[in-house]
C-alpha cells in the first residue's frame, strides 16, 4: 500500500503543486520563494522521513501570509488523503526537540478532530524577513485540513530561528511516529471503531 498524495491548490493569490509520500526517505525538493520557510519545510521532510516535492508561486511581493497558509492547507489535505482510512497507525505521538538554547514540544493525535493549541513566545517579530507569527498560521492550516489535534509548546528559547526550527523538527518527529503502522493494531486505534 502506497501512502501518497499528488495535488495542487490554485487561487488568485497562490499556485501550489505538491507530491507527498509518507513512507519516504526524507528526499525531495521544496521551492516556495521564501527561503526560511523552505528551510523549515525541509526539516519536516528530512526528520519526518517524508518524500516531498513542493513548488509554490505566491504573491510574496505583497506578503508571505497567503503562501505560508496555503502551503499549510495543501500539506494538511495531503497528509489526510495519504493516510486514507488510518488503519494500523499509532495515532498519538509527542516529541521534545532542542536546538541550542531552545526546547520545543509537539504532541499530536491523528483523530479526525482538528485543533491547534499554540504556546510560543518569541524574542522578536522576525527571522530575517519571515514573520514568526506565520508559524502559527501554517500549523493551524495544516491541523484543520489534516484532522490532527496538535499542541505546540516552546519550553524556553531566546533565538527566534532556534525556536522555530525546534518546533518544525519536533513536528516532524511526532508525525513520523504517529503515522507509523503497528502490525498489532487491528483496524483503527479507537474504541469507537473509526477516526
Curated annotation (Swiss-Prot):
* Catalytic activity, as annotated: D-erythro-1-(imidazol-4-yl)glycerol 3-phosphate = 3-(imidazol-4-yl)-2-oxopropyl phosphate + H2O
Q: Which GO terms describe its cellular component?
A: cytoplasm
The primary site where this protein sits is cytoplasm
Localization per Swiss-Prot or TrEMBL = Cytoplasm
Which cysteines bridge via disulfide bonds? none
**Which Gene3D superfamilies has this protein been placed in?**
Imidazole glycerol phosphate dehydratase, domain 1
The family this protein is said to belong to: Belongs to the imidazoleglycerol-phosphate dehydratase family.
What PANTHER family does UniProt report for this protein, alphabetically?
IMIDAZOLEGLYCEROL-PHOSPHATE DEHYDRATASE, IMIDAZOLEGLYCEROL-PHOSPHATE DEHYDRATASE HIS7
Tell me what this protein is called: Imidazoleglycerol-phosphate dehydratase
Gene encoding this polypeptide?
A: hisB
